[in-house]
Amino acid sequence: MRFALLMLVLSGCASHQGIRIPGPTANVGSERVAYAPPEKNEVEHVEPASRSTRQGRRVAKAAESFLGKKRIVVDGQKQRYDCSGMVCAAYKKADIPLSGSSKMLFEQAQDMNVFHKRKRPDVGDIAFFDNTWDRNKNGRRDDKLTHVAIVETVEKDGTITLIHLGGSGITRLVMNMRHPSRKVNADGKKWNDVLRKGKDGGPVLTGELCRGFGSLWSIQNRQLASL
């Protein structure tokens, strides 16, 4: 009798269906892991658009008026005929007092906290360059602030048109700080001009030699605000 009852219990267990646990069971009973939210994608830095202020446009327009000129005259006075002299003359013609060498202009921009390295500068900004020529004639690339130019226009793709006084007189230059080491793009559009003879194999393009920009046209805004 007892044997019969035992067989009945065993047969009942064999026919009984087990409880199903949905999902994977590998971690059932293991230590719980705290929920970690998915990492947020890093927000891409969007550089401010190039500004075209009234003062900046006046500086660029003044520089444009010097193109091709063999001498620079502002208000009846002959101006210094070199790169920084042309820059200062453009500012003077735009009624913004400015004077000094490339180094002095750079120091003024730093002192006024208007020096920047944005890839899209503002119209009227001064572009500063290093190592455009071997000023100390030691054969090394250690010549700082050897050239300056005026930003005339800035395109959406970052292509910058500059006006400068170089070996060929007062002419335009092209530069693209988004692609500083490329002379042209895939379509043949010029991105950077050659600004130095590359006998030593070093950088020669405008974008490679550019140190940054100074928005010294803002001097006029500060002068008006102080009145």
Task: Identify the role of each PLM range.
Residues P97-M175:
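...with weaker cross-activation on analogous glycine-rich loops/strands in unrelated enzymes
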Residues M1-M7:
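Sec-dependent signal peptide recognition
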Residues A14-S99, Q110, V204-L227:
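N-terminal capping segments
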